[in-house]
Amino acid sequence: MMAQSKANGSHYALTAIGLGMLVLGVIMAMWNLVPGFSPADKPTSQGNKTEGGGGILKSKTFSVAYVLVGAGMMLLLLAICLSIRDKRRMRQSEELARIQQQAGTVPHSQEEDSQEEEEDVSSRYYVPSYEEVMNTGYPETRGQEQNPRLSISLPSYESLTGLDEATPTSTRAETETSPGHAPDRQNSKLAKRLKPLKVRRIKSEKLHLKDFRITLPDKNVPPPSIEPLTPPPLYDEVQAKAPDARPPD
């Protein structure tokens, strides 16, 4: 801005000087050309001497006027040329600034577009690893791998009750409705294999505690007498019938 203001000031100064010299030269030329204003046209007592001196003075004034007019024209042309040059430089600097701004914005937009395209391609052709595929259905094992201390700590009561509630009761209903139907050994073996060891151990311990609470004997009630389900074998009758069953001699 300072350089531009200085250049404008120099242009104005050259223009003013050129115009002043041009106007002064024109005035001097008009002074000699218009009759009555020149000293040669004024009447004097000395005739020949004044005529010769007036002609010399007239020629000198004309030469000075021509020099002033020429210098003024040159200064004006110089001021015009300098102003045109400065305007061209300003335009070139503005164009360079625009080009730099466009060059700065275009690569940024191209980088954003390229990043978006790469993200789209990676999301389309993304292949999960073996560990991710194997750990998707087993979040508990993943948590144990991340925190090895969890394997040492015991499960909470809420988790145990949730496991009991989450177990399906369809198998119990089937066994109650069809008591005579024998269970399939293969299905039971597969169920035992598929069940985790921890859950099976916790369930067995809880069932044992429940049965113990149910069958807890009272102090006032006498202990129940245990009777066999089937009657004892009749050994006496078999021994008595044995000699009769022998064939006669």
Curated annotation (Swiss-Prot):
Keywords: Membrane, Phosphoprotein, Transmembrane, Transmembrane helix. The chain crosses the membrane at residues 17-37, 64-84. Residues 220-234 have a biased composition (Pro residues). Residues 99-108, 167-178 have a biased composition (Polar residues). One of its GO terms (cellular component) is membrane. It is a multi-pass membrane protein. This is Transmembrane protein 51.
